[in-house]
A protein has these predicted regions:
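Glycan-recognition and catalytic cores of secretory/periplasmic carbohydrate-active enzymes
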Residues: 2-432
Length: 432
């Protein structure tokens, strides 16, 4: 495998450049090993929700929301297993294909194609788009995606194949990224259908003269911050792609909802219902990633101001003493883990999106990438899922960290190639 080559550096920047080159070389090897693992392991997996996806787990979780005392006793065995025997997931639900993971894999392979010029990586990306067209929610006219299991929430059960505005935008991004590399009419038609779904099937709820929250599914009453952020980004992008001003009008109201509900310290609660007022790492990243993309597309000044406050809160409250991502700054309940692969993946994504506007994130980016390569890569090529208080959760879960980290590192490699590195040789390919 050919190492990445960087342009000649000045003496002042030589040490940083050498470190970056070494990190890029390691990323190439890790991604190569991961694609081989993925080919062996397959594209279905268990999930962080597996304990509660089957009949027993769903009943226990529903009881927890209905009766705290009885419910706590009911879910306690699953929480114990999650903390001390994660492999017990296999007794609770079968391996499943997750659309959100397929979307991340599609984007990851598209980034590898951009970084390497290897056409087989684009073919891998298209493979996952093909799977996504199969897994759409077929009861809806327009293209949309949800979870492949019944999800018990505080507000009721979201049935399998209920469209989620926190999943569909990732699929939109995957199709958009591949469309820009391989501009087929079928990709554009799919993108147009997704935008129609997001604008029509997902509902708006006025919260002020200038803002509206949106529903999480076609059926709820809204109020979740990251849902509005996701939808605002999708429709902002679609408004430009399809020259549709109506999409921007909807997107702008959702954007204003997100901006108006930023806390004075720069954080965002999960929701505005007065109940789900926790602040965690990856949901914070979800919101800020959407804002970063909207600002990149529009130059919206208020969005940049909110991002500045958000970055300040993020760096000051969602990293531990070692400078690594921690799950919560304001937790909703007792947690059974110290660190999460998902948090690291979203941190890398966010830093890559924002380091041009907030250079201090460049240092965070390099630190977290180095940490992931040193501590989270398993011998088989996959990633650890969680750092528990005792040991690790090593169950590979495509939706819960594997696909997100693959995409993040591929994004990192692609961005490195844009910054002057020669294209790496990436010879390991998934079999067809």
């Amino acid at each position: 495998m050919t190492a990445l080559a960087f342009p000649t550096a000045s003496s002042d920047n030589l040490m940083t450049t050498d470190r970056t080159k070494e990190l890029n070389d390691r990323v190439v090897h890790v991604l190569s090993d991961f694609t081989q693992w993925l080919a062996r392991y397959g594209e279905v997996s268990r999930d962080h929700q597996t304990f509660f996806a089957g009949t027993t787990g769903r009943a226990a979780k529903r009881l927890y929301y209905d009766s705290k005392l009885l419910g706590t006793a009911a879910v306690a065995p699953m929480i114990f297993l999650e903390a001390f025997l994660p492999s017990a997931r296999r007794f609770f639900h079968h391996p499943t294909r997750f659309p959100i993971a397929d979307a991340h894999y599609a984007m990851g392979f598209a980034f590898l194609y951009q970084a390497t010029g290897d056409l087989s990586q684009l073919e891998n990306a298209i493979h996952f788009l093909t799977e996504l067209k199969k897994s759409r929610c077929h009861q809806f006219k327009e293209y949309c995606w949800g979870y492949p299991f019944d999800w018990v929430t505080r507000n009721g059960v979201l049935k399998e194949q209920t469209p989620l505005i926190t999943t569909t935008p990732y699929v939109y991004e995957a199709f958009l990224q591949v469309f820009r590399l391989d501009p087929r009419d079928e990709w554009k038609l799919t993108l147009e259908s997704i935008a129609q779904h997001a604008s029509i099937d997902i509902k708006d709820f006025k919260t002020s003269e200038k803002s509206s929250s949106c529903s999480y599914t076609p059926y709820d009453k809204g109020g979740v911050i990251n849902a509005a952020a996701y939808r605002s980004f999708l429709l902002t992008s679609a408004s430009l792609l399809f020259s549709n001003d109506n999409y921007w009008k909807i997107a702008e109201r959702n954007l204003n909802f997100v901006l108006e509900n930023q806390n004075p310290d720069g954080s965002w609660f999960y929701a505005v219902d007065g109940v789900r007022d926790f602040v965690d790492h990856y949901h914070t990243c979800f919101v800020m990633k959407a804002l970063a993309k909207i600002h990149a597309l529009t130059g919206h000044p208020a969005t940049l101001k909110a991002l500045g406050k958000g970055v300040g809160y993020y760096l000051g409250n969602l990293f531990d003493a070692d400078g690594l991502p921690m799950p919560f700054s304001r937790a909703p309940r007792l947690t059974v883990y110290k660190r999460e692969l998902y948090d690291c993946a979203e941190c890398i994504n966010l830093c890559l999106l924002l380091r041009d506007r907030f250079p201090m994130l460049g240092t965070t980016l390099e630190k977290v990438v180095a940490h992931v390569l040193q501590a989270w890569v398993k011998r088989d090529g996959s990633f650890r899922s969680r750092k528990l208080y005792l040991g690790w959760d090593n169950v590979p879960m495509h939706r819960w960290g594997q696909s997100q980290m693959f995409r993040s590192l591929a994004f990192y490699l692609s961005e490195g190639s844009k910054r002057g590195a020669q294209r790496p040789m990436f010879q390991d390919r998934m079999p067809s």
